[in-house]
Amino acid sequence: MADVFEFELEGHESQASPQRHAYHYDNCTEIMEDDHMYSNVADGQISAPPPSSSYMEDPMMESIQLCASAINPPNVRVGPEDFQLLKVLGKGGYGKVFQVRKTTGSDNGQIFAMKVLQKATIVRNQKDTAHTKAERNILEAVKSPFICDLLYAFQTGGKLYLILEYLSGGELFMHLEREGMFMENVAKFYLSEIVVSLEHLHQQGIIYRDLKPENILLDAYGHVKLTDFGLCKEEIEGDQKTHTFCGTIEYMAPEILMRCGHGKAVDWWSLGALMFDMLTGGPPFTAENRRKTIDKILKGRLTLPAYLSNEARDLIKKLLKRHVDTRLGAGLSDAEEIKSHAFFKTTDWNLVYARQLEAPFKPNIENDEDTSLFDARFTKMTPVDSPCETNFSLNGDNPFVGFTYVAPSVLEMMNKGGHGGISVAHLASSMSRAGAAKSPRKPGDPETASILHGGHSNLFGHGPNSEAPQAFGYGIGSQMTTTTAGGAGIQQPYQSFSGGYPEDDAMDTSTPRASESRETTTGNGSTTTTRPSNVGSSASTPIPLPKRVM
């Protein structure tokens, strides 16, 4: 697939205040009691509270039994031995993604996706280590029906484990590969749910920065779930800008390429590129190599096929405005500008938020273990969690102290299963930072901000010495790399274009472009794979369905 980059530009974010991360979890359980009612305060005679037996006899008081099973309910702490490997969903330099079945606890028998990461590979780079911990924090903090959910996180001496919900609908990329392109009503469904998911991230002060078909998964009902938060930027308020050079080239906004600072509006450019991709068969700007692709993004004319509706053409043109100030969604109202566009005039946004719109494609799943919508190149592999050559102490200098996590939803399930009367909220606060993560973040509060959104990572990228093919949907995919074709490293982000932007007006045409190529870069170098460009046709001409090549 396409190249993904991340560069921290000196002189900008390097001057930001250092972030502190709360990775230590208390092992105690806090029990809150109501204030006692005291009498005779006026004359200085304060009666002692009644003995505890009096409370137990009061039918209005709730009994709380303190016992080992209540404070430390069984099966809260999990490990690799609690999961049965079923299938390989993906593989990369940092590790593998498996389909697994839980074999213990109240969720015994449930199917999950298990991402296994090699510590030795991650700790080679201090930044990778920090990003990995921050990525896990984002997965914990951001809860939305349109975001892939994290259920457990744990570690061994040599590996990190993330247990995510299994999304049997596969990647949107695979469906586009099969169909070639989508009809407008189909694209509208997916775009509406993507808009809502980006809106949620923006409201949390997060820029996504890597929207593309590979990072969009479908659940068993055909609804959208975003995954891969490795390129996110947190703590962005209002029109605040950041200066990291990152993203997947074909979907990157011009202001990222120009290194002039960017904000949340880069996600709306990517939405426009994705919309174009869905409706035409490929991204709007592609070429035979990376440099020419960037040149087209910065200076090329946008070519729109004639078969698109006026509303679709107008929305694409307004999203792909090179001048940020004129781009739809760049204002303070953010997603509201896009939701009110004529392309979505028939969309009931209340139904979108409630996930009550009927999906155009409902996966034909035989059972919970069905992996037919994932790449057979992976699922035919024998699932083996390979042994580690290097192990790290789980105490002392362990760089991943505090990585363990159990979702509140899991604790709630266990509580209903009869593990005592301790409040689930107390259990959650003792096992993780879930309580703090759900608290409103106050602008300008660095400690709270770091708890909520600890940073960005390349946790979901493939690491060095990775093997092709790569998995995309669950994130062991394209690495943020500085490797170019032939292995030459990029020392600086693209900077050859020094002039102003060309006109933003798109050129409508019915002339299809020739197929162009996208580069796929791995840690060992890069290869080039061909993907179709936008396909144009007249309204009376049958629309060819191009075949995507992965």
Swiss-Prot record:
Result after altering residue 404 to A: Abolishes phosphorylation and causes a decrease in the number of germline progenitors
Pfam families: Pkinase (PF00069), Pkinase_C (PF00433)
Alphabetized InterPro entries for the sequence: AGC-kinase_C, Kinase-like_dom_sf, Pkinase_C, Prot_kinase_dom, Protein_kinase_ATP_BS, Ribosomal_S6_kinase, Ser/Thr_kinase_AS
Start and end residues of each AGC-kinase C-terminal domain: 345-415
Sites of Phosphothreonine modification: 404
Top EC group: transferase
Keyword Magnesium annotated: yes
Chief site of localization: other
Residue ranges of the region described as Disordered: 433-466, 484-550
Cofactors, names only: Mg(2+)
UniProt cross-references to Gene3D superfamilies, sorted A to Z: Phosphorylase Kinase, domain 1, Transferase(Phosphotransferase) domain 1
Modified residues (Phosphoserine): 439
Transmembrane keyword on record: no
Organism domain of life: Eukaryota
Similarity section: Belongs to the protein kinase superfamily. AGC Ser/Thr protein kinase family. S6 kinase subfamily.
Protein name per UniProt: Ribosomal protein S6 kinase beta
UniProt source species: Caenorhabditis elegans
Organism phylogeny: Eukaryota, Metazoa, Ecdysozoa, Nematoda, Chromadorea
